[in-house]
């Protein structure tokens, strides 16, 4: 019998740890460590950038909500005043058409608004020829005299509209005209003239009711809203004439007419409310602008704040996040450098 062939012992296929580690030493392991650190740092920076971008968008969105709500609230406040004065002109007109208007009614109707004398400074009657008849402070017209007011825009728009064709844009749907602010030559005070035509059913014009409004009331109300040194509120007509304006808490620009390329003139004019981010042509400051039409009157309330102010808290967050991430980056790179230097020494 032949001897059986001896079966060789099974080979150990496991790689010894020393050989395995030897394969990862040197430049290969160095590259793996470096790439891992860079990948983690890149992910960290991307996360920081995306988070900061999201926070910036949230800050601007919050500013838009704030300005939009303020514009709505301020227009409601403006509407309450205008509606009370408007009702006074309607009552006075109806009494005149009915032939029941007496000098004593001027004061009674004006006082019923609750706005005399701080807001509604005068409620007047002008005849069909444009002459002053009387008012709540001069019922018979003896103090003032029956002066000719036919050349005034708020009277012409009703008695001779062809002479002031552009004034029609300041007429409300039911016939109330809201004029530009006028600076009194004697009183040196601004007033806004609201006027309504007195017309009989047969088309005969009997005159005009004129309500003189004190725009300082709106300036005072708007100045109570803290919008920062570069923020403000403006009450603007369709004719781009400023009825009231407060910038940085200070009244300014009463009676001025904005140019066609002004910040507010460049905003949509046909929408009832809205917002936009605009850059001023004058001071080059970017602002968040919100606006709201004042009911059916040819007026709008604009609320503007600087995006710089809106992002002040975000900038603080950005500085902290970038600083911390920068320190983490430096520490990670330094740690990786120490580790790689140790590997080279082991080689």
Give the positions of each predicted feature.
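Cytoplasm-proximal transmembrane signaling helix
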Residues: 302, 308-347
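Short hydrophobic alpha-helical segments used for membrane anchoring or interfacial signaling
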Residues: 123-130, 232-239
């Amino acid at each position: 019998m032949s001897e059986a062939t001896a079966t060789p012992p099974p080979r150990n296929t496991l790689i010894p740890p020393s050989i395995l580690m030897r394969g990862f030493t040197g430049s290969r392991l160095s590259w793996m460590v470096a790439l891992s650190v860079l990948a983690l740092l890149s992910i960290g920076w991307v996360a920081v950038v995306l988070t900061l971008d999201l926070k910036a968008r949230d800050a601007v969105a919050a500013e838009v909500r704030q300005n939009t709500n303020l514009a709505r609230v301020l227009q409601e406040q403006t509407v309450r005043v205008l509606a009370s004065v408007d009702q006074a002109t309607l009552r006075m007109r109806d009494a005149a058409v009915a032939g029941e208007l007496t000098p004593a009614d001027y004061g009674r109707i004006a006082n019923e608004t609750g706005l005399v004398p701080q807001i509604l400074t005068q409620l007047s009657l002008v005849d069909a020829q444009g002459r002053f008849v009387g008012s709540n402070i001069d019922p018979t017209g003896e103090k003032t005299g029956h002066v000719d007011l036919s050349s005034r825009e708020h009277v012409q728009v009703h008695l001779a509209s062809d002479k002031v064709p552009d004034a029609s844009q300041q007429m409300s749907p039911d016939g109330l005209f809201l004029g530009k602010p006028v600076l009194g030559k004697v009183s040196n005070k601004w007033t806004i003239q609201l006027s309504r035509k007195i017309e009989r059913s047969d088309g005969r014009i009997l005159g005009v009711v004129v309500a003189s409004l004190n725009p300082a009331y709106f300036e005072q109300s708007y100045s109570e809203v803290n919008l920062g040194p570069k923020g403000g509120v403006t009450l603007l007509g369709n004719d781009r004439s400023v009825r009231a304006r407060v910038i940085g808490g200070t009244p300014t620009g009463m009676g001025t007419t904005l140019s066609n390329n002004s910040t507010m003139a460049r905003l949509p004019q046909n929408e009832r409310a809205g917002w936009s981010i605009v850059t001023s042509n004058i001071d080059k400051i970017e602002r968040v602008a919100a606006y709201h039409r004042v009911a059916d009157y040819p007026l709008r309330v604009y609320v503007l704040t600087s995006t710089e102010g809106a992002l002040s808290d975000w900038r603080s967050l950005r500085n902290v996040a970038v600083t911390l991430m920068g320190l983490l980056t430096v520490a990670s790179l330094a740690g990786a450098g120490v580790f790689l230097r140790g590997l080279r020494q082991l080689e």
